[in-house]
Regions:
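Short, Lys/Arg-enriched N-terminal segments with co-localized hydrophobic residues
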Residues: 1-3
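Sec-dependent N-terminal signal peptides
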Residues: 7-16
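N-terminal secretory-pathway/extracellular module detecting exported/lumenal segments
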Residues: 22-84, 89-178
Length: 178
């Protein structure tokens, strides 16, 4: 009996850390000071966990910030926890590109190609809406990607920069939620 009790306690101590990071849709929605809604459309929402925003590099014009975001998919009835690292280059932000380019067409072309932000998703865990792990965690090893302007990844990068420095990296859009 003592052996079984010790074994049960050992299993519980091992499993508690695995479930402590679980998050539910209600927790995201009911804690707006901890989880900031940064993106929303008909198929999903994206939140950034304010407690996870961490400046890794401050070397103007270059900045690196990490944060955790939660992408809610209403299409697939899951939410994904995304551990991201964002790379910022102020020499290529929208304001700088406005000054550098000679025409609207050139500006539009450059902004859609690269507006000074890249990101890497380091780890993904997928949950159901009640917080039960559906898949993961999945560790990723990929090169940095350029997010599309106004995409969930772009808005999370913009918010992480804003929250870190109390200034916008790029000019805020009309649909921006912060």
């Amino acid at each position: 009996v003592i052996y079984m009790t010790k074994l049960l306690l050992l299993v519980l101590f091992i499993l508690i850390p695995l479930t402590s990071n679980a998050i539910s849709l209600n927790e995201l929605r009911n804690n707006p000071t901890k989880y900031k809604l940064v993106y929303s459309d008909s198929s999903g929402d994206q939140y950034v966990d304010n407690d996870t925003i961490n400046v890794i590099r401050y070397a103007p014009p270059y900045y690196v910030i990490s944060s955790t975001s939660y992408l809610v998919s209403y299409e697939y009835n899951v939410l994904s926890e995304l551990h991201n690292t964002y790379f910022y280059d102020y020499n290529n932000n929208i304001s700088t590109l406005l000054e550098k380019t000679r025409s609207e067409q050139e500006f539009g072309s450059q902004v859609t190609q690269y507006a000074g932000i890249k990101y890497i998703t380091n780890k993904i865990t997928i949950f159901n809406y009640n917080g039960k792990v559906y898949q993961g965690p999945i560790l990723r090893n990929e090169s940095a990607k350029i997010p599309k302007i106004l995409s969930p990844a772009y808005e999370s990068a913009m918010y992480s920069f804003y929250k870190s420095y109390n200034t916008y990296f790029n000019i805020p859009s009309k649909i921006q939620k912060f």
